[in-house]
């Protein structure tokens, strides 16, 4: 059986210190994503921890350092909007939720295109803003210090952004990487 997504609760040993570190960083990176991001922050310890939870996939072989997004912290608030998409340029994508007491509904949704029945895509030609064209087949709730890893080509979207500032908005850390095996 092939793994398409996995949930790791209590990922960081000290999530409060990770959150405090994230909040001290400048959120000055804008791009094709809601909200704003920091510079990448992907240490050898983080890499080893992810590899520990994915022994069947082998070592992490590429973290797309040139993109500056692997390990970046991101903030999005209730005013931000997202769309259904995939991240097909990498084998794996992930988010670690870093807002304590966040609404459970502010997690990640996994989608299937209604017309084609596709869960995975190496393109984003479908209208990701038109949620009526998609079936939501799984919801992964937002829980403090939960790491969610899923295949990069799996259609997904953030759900229910919340808050209005850095302290109470949806703070998370992004990951994009390849491994020796899928």
Predicted regions and their residues:
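Non-heme Fe(II)/2-oxoglutarate
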Residues: 1-84, 107-108
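Catalytic core of non-heme Fe(II) oxygenases with the double-stranded beta-helix
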Residues: 76-182
């Amino acid at each position: 059986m092939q793994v398409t997504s996995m949930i790791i609760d209590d990922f960081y040993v000290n999530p409060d210190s990770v959150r405090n570190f994230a909040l001290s960083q400048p959120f000055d990176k804008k791009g094709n994503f809601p909200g704003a991001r920091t510079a990448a922050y992907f240490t050898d310890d983080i890499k080893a921890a992810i590899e520990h939870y994915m022994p069947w996939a082998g070592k992490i072989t590429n973290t797309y350092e040139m993109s500056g997004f692997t390990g970046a912290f991101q903030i999005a608030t209730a005013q931000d909007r997202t769309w259904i998409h995939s991240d097909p340029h990498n084998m794996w994508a992930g988010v670690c939720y870093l807002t304590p007491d966040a609404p459970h509904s502010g997690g990640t949704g996994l989608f299937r295109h209604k017309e084609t029945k596709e869960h995975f895509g190496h393109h984003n030609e479908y209208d990701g803003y038109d949620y009526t064209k998609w079936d939501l087949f799984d919801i992964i709730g937002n829980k403090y210090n939960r790491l969610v890893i899923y295949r990069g080509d799996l259609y997904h979207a953030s759900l229910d952004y919340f808050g209005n500032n850095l302290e109470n908005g949806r703070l998370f850390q992004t990951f994009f990487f390849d491994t020796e095996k899928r």
